[in-house]
């Protein structure tokens, strides 16, 4: 979802996270703040040693509280628990604040791996070696 608009690839993953992520060895995490769900992220398994995090969303009313950082750190931890070697992400150039966070956490710019389904809107691909 980019600026509130669903892209062609989004409806299936948003409406069927069980099939899109969980049944394929992935995970979905939610963030609670003041007893409310205010954020989420999906962790998609690309292969035995590789994951991609996707669909990171934080409620605008709770941004700048470190929630995105905590969700990404949870993804990193789960990847390590599953003995993954790399964590990937796709993003657009319209999200410079997110890019700063990704760099701070240890992600770097890379070319897409062959097992990644690159979305039409993707303008930047990043990876963290674990």
Residues of each region from the PLM?
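Conserved glycine-rich acetyl-CoA-binding loop
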Residues: 36, 51, 59-73, 80-82, ...
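C-terminal "cap" of GNAT-fold acetyltransferases
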Residues: 85-88, 92-130
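Acetyl-CoA-dependent GNAT
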Residues: 1-54, 59-60, 72-74, 78, ...
């Amino acid at each position: 979802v980019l600026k509130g608009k669903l892209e062609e690839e989004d409806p299936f993953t948003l409406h069927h996270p069980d099939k899109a992520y969980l049944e394929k060895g992935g995970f979905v995490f939610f963030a609670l703040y003041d007893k409310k769900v205010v954020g989420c992220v999906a962790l998609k398994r690309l292969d035995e040693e590789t994951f991609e995090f996707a669909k990171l969303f934080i409620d605008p009313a709770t941004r700048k509280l470190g929630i995105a950082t905590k969700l990404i750190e949870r993804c990193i931890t789960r990847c390590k628990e599953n003995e993954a070697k790399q964590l990937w992400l796709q993003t657009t150039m319209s999200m410079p604040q997110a890019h700063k966070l990704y760099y701070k956490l240890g992600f770097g710019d890379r070319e897409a791996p062959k097992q990644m389904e690159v979305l039409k809107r993707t303008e930047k691909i990043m990876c963290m070696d674990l």
